[in-house]
């Protein structure tokens, strides 16, 4: 054993070092077997360029023909033809200025130009047009992957087209025939960057696995109608899956992708995506349609062969520099859609689908936005009580430099309706004039602000809601007027650091006083308001709640201190911030929730954030919040990440949310997993482990529930012309109320991808990491 130890140690060291280089760059590896054109390019009209012929022996019948034998080299411009024997024929046609010059070559014929190399036993070439034929030969593209053979190879239109009779095409390097496409006719169009194949047979090795009377393969990044690279995978949930996307280049500003997605256990899904570019902006529309899902039986288990669908519309644009249009609309057929079916337009962790339309106008000192907002919540209770704002009008008017003051007026009008007819509905009108006195210089600033918050509610309260004693007692008409006063000051001190040449440290104390009087708001229902997360920057917010339904009283001072360190290139290397809110009187709105029912005053809320970029590869980031009203640490997170490059990364993280904070932020939570709080520790990593092999993994463990929250491991092998990855994922998808246990979904999947048809040669680690229920997010 002792004798073997040095060998084992050397092997481990070699593997670690080799994985760091992985032949340095897979793209460079894949170009090792690709020919390049390394001669100086000749410019000018090819037909006007001279023809140069070298040979061991020449027999000429001037000017009609000549026979060259022995190491024959024919050159014209950037084209070169070599052979054992070449016959040059020249025919002067009546009315033609330039004679027709052709060559017939036999014996070890080779043709090359900046785009392609041809090789065969016999060939013919028109020196005027560069049309070239090679019998029973082989070809290889120059400067990019792509090769094959054919009974007859033709070059046409100055080598734009390569036409093969009974030919093959593959992106694999010479000596590797892992896959190929065979056709009775194959046409490669270099300008359009596409290969068209008739009577196509797709082969893995020597075994044909797929037939199509016609097929297109893209061999570049140019937009072109045709079939894209197929994809196959297997999951325990869906069985064998096969996707064959078709790209439709409709017009310069329109295109679409139509993808039949076969799932062995569920059926055939059609994934359709349409993209456009118009004067009002650009956008994407998508419709995924699964007409008869053989597994899904609906929320109540009685809907057999249910039709499942997804519709998405995303749009963003500016027109005439003043009009702004935005759409973010996603709707699915059922709450379990993202749990069962994979989509780039949502995931189970979102919890809801957003449906927002906005149209806005912006001028020099005012803007207006008209919007429609609705949410499809994926929990039964949430979806049955969701509210929509249809319509909502927001307006802003700005007037700066009115003497020493800046003015701002914000107004809103919104109509709230509920998907549940037994819930209250309301019209809300709000106006918020603000006057600021900003003062600043090179080392500090102070801003004094006064505003008036005036809101009117006209509520429609159903009788069934009003008669329920457990519901709040609402009023049909409510007026709420609240003044607000704020003073916010900050000073920045900086100094050069003695122990680090060129480094600068700053010290930035900040203090803010905020006053808002108390107003009991129990007579107003909650339509669009939730408790906001309180991190360090949140200490200096005006509001405790989002929306306008709850405006908490305030008589408080927020203080904070931030220190930053910049290197000699002014890159921030370190910062730390800590702050607190001191309450002179308790903050309240009138309701009886835990966070609002405390009589405590003094320093109640503390928050801190820190970030440390140790070097360009290693960094730390974290934050914590403490609320004495809840008597606990409310939120916390910490991340340490080492990222060497796009494929080499290790991240450790921890996140925490106290049960009291969750109950205060989301009062109606019945899942025991959340009622006891969140305390999750996890790690995410990706690393090449050997030549062309890469592994990724993610593991999150809930220390409160004492169970894994998510597990992911993936292994990918990459070559120059194909890649395969195998992955396993286990994730929580719901709560089993009957068994009082978490529901898990186990997924085993594999994907096969053809490589070399475009410029990408990544190891695929990013795609694998983003496929998990908790996608990787960079820490810095």
From Swiss-Prot:
Its main location: membrane. Coiled coil: none annotated. Keywords: Cell outer membrane, Membrane, Signal. It is found in: Cell outer membrane. This is LPS-assembly protein LptD. One of its GO terms (cellular component) is cell outer membrane. Together with LptE, is involved in the assembly of lipopolysaccharide (LPS) at the surface of the outer membrane. It comes from Yersinia pseudotuberculosis serotype I (strain IP32953). Component of the lipopolysaccharide transport and assembly complex. Interacts with LptE and LptA. One of its GO terms (biological process) is Gram-negative-bacterium-type cell outer membrane assembly. Belongs to the LptD family. Residues 1-24 form the signal peptide. It holds the Pfam family LptD_N.
């Amino acid at each position: 054993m002792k004798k073997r130890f040095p060998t084992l140690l050397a092997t481990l060291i070699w593997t670690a070092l080799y994985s760091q280089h992985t032949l340095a760059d897979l793209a460079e590896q894949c170009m090792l077997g690709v020919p390049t054109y390394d001669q100086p390019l000749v410019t000018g009209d090819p037909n006007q360029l001279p023809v140069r012929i070298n040979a061991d022996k020449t027999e000429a019948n001037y000017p009609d023909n000549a026979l060259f034998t022995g190491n024959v080299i024919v050159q014209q411009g950037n084209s070169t033809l070599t052979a054992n024997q070449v016959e040059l024929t020249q025919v002067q046609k009546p009315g033609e200025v330039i004679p027709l010059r052709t060559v017939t070559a036999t014996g070890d014929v080779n043709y090359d130009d900046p785009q392609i190399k041809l090789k065969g036993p016999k060939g013919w070439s028109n020196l005027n047009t560069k049309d070239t034929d090679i019998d029973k030969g082989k070809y290889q593209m120059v400067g990019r992957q792509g090769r094959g053979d054919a009974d007859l190879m033709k070059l046409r239109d100055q080598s734009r087209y390569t036409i093969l009779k009974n030919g093959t095409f593959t992106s694999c390097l010479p000596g590797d025939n892992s896959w190929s496409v065979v056709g009775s006719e194959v046409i490669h169009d270099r300008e359009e960057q596409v290969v068209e194949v008739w009577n196509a047979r797709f082969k893995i090795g020597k075994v044909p696995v797929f037939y199509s009377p016609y097929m297109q393969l893209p061999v570049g990044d140019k937009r072109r109608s045709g079939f894209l690279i197929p994809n196959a995978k297997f999951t325990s949930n869906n069985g064998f899956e096969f996707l064959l996307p078709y790209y439709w280049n409709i017009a310069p500003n329109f295109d679409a992708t139509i993808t039949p997605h076969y799932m062995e256990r569920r059926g055939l899904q059609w994934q359709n995506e349409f993209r456009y570019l118009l004067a009002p902006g650009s956008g994407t529309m998508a419709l995924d349609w699964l007409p008869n899902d053989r597994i899904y039986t609906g929320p109540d288990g009685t809907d057999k062969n249910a039709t499942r669908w997804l519709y998405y519309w995303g749009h963003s644009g500016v027109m005439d520099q003043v009009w702004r249009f935005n759409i973010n609309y996603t709707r699915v057929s059922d709450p379990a859609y993202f749990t069962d079916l994979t989509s780039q337009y949502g995931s189970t962790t979102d919890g809801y689908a957003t449906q927002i339309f906005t149209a806005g106008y912006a001028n020099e000192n005012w803007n207006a936005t008209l919007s429609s907002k609705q949410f499809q919540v994926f929990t039964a209770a949430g979806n049955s009580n969701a509210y929509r704002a249809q319509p909502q009008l927001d307006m802003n008017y700005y007037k700066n430099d009115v003497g020493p003051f800046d003015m701002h007026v914000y107004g809103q009008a919104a109509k709230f309706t509920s998907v549940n007819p037994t819930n209250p509905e309301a019209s809300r009108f709000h106006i918020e004039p603000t006057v600021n006195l900003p003062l600043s210089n090179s080392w500090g600033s102070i801003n004094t602000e006064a505003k008036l918050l005036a809101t009117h509610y006209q509520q429609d309260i159903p009788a069934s809601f009003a008669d329920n004693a457990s519901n709040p007692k609402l009023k049909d008409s409510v007026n709420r007027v609240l003044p607000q006063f704020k003073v916010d000051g900050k000073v920045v001190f900086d100094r050069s650091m003695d122990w680090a040449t060129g480094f600068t440290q700053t010290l930035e104390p900040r203090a803010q006083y905020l006053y808002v009087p108390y107003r009991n708001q129990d007579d107003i229902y909650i339509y669009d308001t939730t408790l906001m997360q309180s991190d360090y920057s949140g200490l200096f917010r005006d509001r405790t709640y989002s929306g306008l339904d709850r405006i908490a009283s305030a008589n408080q001072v927020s203080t904070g201190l931030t220190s930053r360190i910049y290197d000699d290139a002014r890159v921030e290397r370190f910062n730390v911030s800590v702050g607190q809110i001191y309450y002179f009187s308790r903050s309240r709105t009138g309701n009886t929730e835990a966070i609002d029912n405390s009589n405590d005053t003094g320093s109640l809320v503390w928050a801190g954030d820190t970030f440390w970029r140790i070097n360009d590869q290693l960094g730390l980031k974290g934050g914590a919040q403490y609320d004495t009203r809840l008597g606990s640490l409310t939120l916390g997170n910490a991340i340490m990440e080492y990222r060497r490059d796009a494929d080499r990364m290790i991240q450790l993280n921890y996140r925490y949310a106290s049960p009291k904070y969750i109950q205060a932020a989301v009062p109606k939570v019945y899942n025991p997993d959340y009622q006891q709080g969140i305390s999750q520790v996890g790690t995410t990593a990706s690393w090449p482990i050997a030549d062309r092999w890469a592994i990724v993994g993610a593991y999150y463990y809930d220390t409160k529930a004492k169970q894994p929250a998510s597990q992911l491991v993936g292994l990918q092998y990459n070559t120059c012309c194909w890649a395969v990855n195998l992955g396993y994922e286990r994730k929580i998808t719901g709560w089993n109320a009957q068994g009082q246990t978490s529901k898990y979904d186990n997924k085993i999947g594999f994907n096969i991808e053809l490589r070399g048809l475009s410029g990408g040669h990544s190891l695929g680690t990013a795609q694998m990491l983003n496929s998990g229920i908790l996608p990787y997010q960079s820490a810095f």
